[in-house]
């Protein structure tokens, strides 16, 4: 059994039936769950989900209301295991940020990796593998590699 953290883009596509990636993501998540893999989410990916879901469609968002987004977030919390925010996350994040000299927007993805390390999660499922740095203990997985 493998443990996967679902990246924000995976969650967004899983709830956006109009997305060209919807079927790929749906198939991948169903495959993982039916093969006894565990799928996790964290507060950060839910916060990022909210940002994109409530942003207007004209600026690359989903254009949802707060109420629609709240329902979607509750569904995600009910469907996947929500990882606890622990004090170790900041320490791990700071160590990764300084060791790898990460700056700018990549810091957000680095924090996801810190959460994964703090909880001994082995894999991150994402549509954007290049957003993540290479960390020996973490395998970054694109849905195509699971569904091929």
Protein language model annotation of sequence segments:
Residues 9-10, 44, 88, 130:
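Alpha-helix/helix-capping structural signal
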Residues 40-43, 126:
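Short beta-strand segments at enzyme active-site cores
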Residues 35-36, 79, 135:
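Structured helix-beta-strand junction loops
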Residues 1-41, 58-68, 147:
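Short, well-structured N-terminal submotif of metal-dependent ribonuclease cores
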Residues 53-81:
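Helix-adjacent hinge/juxtasegments
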Residues 3, 110-148:
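Acidic, PIN/NYN-like endoribonuclease modules and their adjacent C-terminal/linker elements
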Residues 81-127:
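Active-site neighborhoods of divalent-metal-dependent phosphate/nucleic-acid chemistry enzymes
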